[in-house]
Amino acid sequence: MLMKTNKLISDLKKSLSSCNVLETLEERYAYAQDATNIKEIKNLPDVVVFVENIEQVQNVVKLANKYKTPIICRGAGTNVVGACSTEHGGIILNFSKMNKILEINRENMTARVQSGVVLGDLQNAVESFGLFYPPDPSNLAVSTIGGSIAQSSGGAKSFKYGTTKDYVIDMKVVMANGEILQTGSNTIKNATGYNLNTLFVGSEGTLGIVIEATIKLIPKPESKKVLMAYFDTVKTAVSAVNKIIEHRIFPATIDFMDKNAIQTVEKFYPANLLTDKEAALIIEIDGFECSMDYQEKIIVDILNSSDASAIQASHNEEEYNRIWTARRSSMGACAKMKPNVTTDDVIVPRKNLEKLVLGIREICEKYNLAVCMVGHVGDGSVHPQIPIDYSDEAEYKRYKLAKAEIYDLTAKLDGILSGEHGVGSLKREHINKVVNSVALDYMRQIKKTFDPNNILNPYKIF
């Protein structure tokens, strides 16, 4: 085994610049985990490779086939389901050097980018053209477009604008045999053959290696404003969500924080949040400047009629950023409570939101676990963030039991286990709770057809 690995590394150095091949124990350890930090993952990658162009990616694929070695693609490693973890060793294929925005076309309203482009950089670049790329995961300051495509990530604005899958119109993909596949076209509509874009978006690097993508853009909204409404019960908060939608007002976001999340954020990252409230909604409105007062009035009236106990509104960019920074700081705040923190991404139809939130709280209380809940409740998504100590074996066992029950509850409420994080290795043992066996069999057949040697991120999803 060691001899094979040494030969692989030697061949990689011949194909790539030696400075782009990392092989020391310390270097490999740094890339063995992603943001999930799964306790069970013990194996290190055999080698870490930084690629700079398509030809180098093809060379790595050729060698992976030769040595029957897994390839695990990595952008910033921010995913939280173990999709970048190295359970079986292999090659970490790092795309941080393929980070060029190749083209922004104002007329077509598209951008062509390499996989390593950081989402926040892309958003800032297109906004200078008066354009807008809506998907906005909380880690957009560091996460990459390649990772977003792999996990089909969304964010707060997915309620109004959709997720990554709604904006990818074309990709260049290096297949497991080294061929380059073009999945779509440079047009906004395409009904010419199968839609291969939707096959690769969310495939977690198991079907092919996305090296370049063409992204659909939309006009940048003229104005935006955020409201933070507090409630004395989860029930009234969830009820307000449905009332807003029923009134045909479509905010850019309707996000949620429960009392634990509010208090934890305020403790570690003070933001003038009201810590005595049971829940809060973060509602962003956008559009033409002339429509903002009307939208705000309608929503405030609905919130007041829904028993909102307090409403904070942004009147300038500083206040806007304060509210959103507080919401996005929840995970970081939870991380200060214990050595480890886990998050999740369960989603149910909105009619079952209250049952999901209260059910998760009951499960965590049953197993004596703290939980902070945030989420994009406009589309039914909840992120339970559980701070734990992996070195406490008893607590970790309780955590695993609680997770299984949370997934059972989600399935019972007609939900799914991931709306935007993916499955990875963390949820694969539970996927059959929400995906039927026939669908899973077809997924496995697709995987085998695209990757007969099982070298592309093996043992992820199922």
Where do the PLM segments sit?
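Alpha-helix capping/hinge segments and adjacent helical runs
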Residues: 17-18, 411-423, 452-456
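Activity-critical C-terminal alpha-helical subdomain
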Residues: 179, 428-462
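C-terminal substrate-recognition/cap domain of FAD-linked oxidoreductases
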Residues: 22-32, 218-219, 228-233, 238-402, ...
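FAD-binding subdomain of flavoenzyme oxidoreductases
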Residues: 100-255, 456
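N-terminal flexible segment immediately upstream of the FAD-binding catalytic core
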Residues: 1-62, 78-109, 261-270, 317-343, ...
